[in-house]
């Protein structure tokens, strides 16, 4: 994914920059909602102020990413047409360094809301100095996972207000966001932070998960084909949908495979789709490969598991 490489160059101030602005803002009519009432837990050093950058590869539409996020927020997009009662929290990818807010965020929300699904776009913390998760003094707990746990609980807390069925709240993520899907789907019995309000009394277990070209699934292990211990799959892990291309140059397809086998061993319902070609970081944007039809597969799967009407 050339855009990710370029994004890292921007974060570390090496290479050209296109249309850089101070911070990301959603489209008119939508408002970012801070997910923490005050300072986020486990706040640590950041590389600098939040910055939003728009880049474009020749022949491709532009993509916007945000880096150095230290103040996480969510943006709620209401369903269009008939409300199915389902909600999806979307985690953009970007290697835990940046977040591709349109390619793997707002464009996904446009699709979900067109299907009658409430979309909650999470701008989770990517301070710009650490990957997720790693050993050492900082972060003591993975800040992105804290943000994900908090947001799932918030959606459940506001379910009646937002027209959401509290038993139909899922998560969907790309690349590093796909790893975050796996992390929050397997780390829900205990929050990694002290409760701050009534929303933290709600369950932070998603009812389903969709991980698209996930990465980081084999970190923190010395074996060649072993699941990251920070993704402790059990029979209580929610149903999962996995999709990846075998020619993915950023996150090898074994990231999906190792998670798939762990889910199967635990007896968790899982559907996986692998494609010979497709690369990495395509989001919903059309390509010349069959993998571009993945939204229809996810929609069918959601109907199959009873999250949206058949």
Predicted regions and their residues:
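Short beta-strand-to-loop junctions in surface cap/lid or active-site-entrance loops
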Residues: 36-38, 74-83, 162, 230-234
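Primarily recognizes the serine-hydrolase "nucleophile elbow" in alpha/beta-hydrolase
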Residues: 146-235
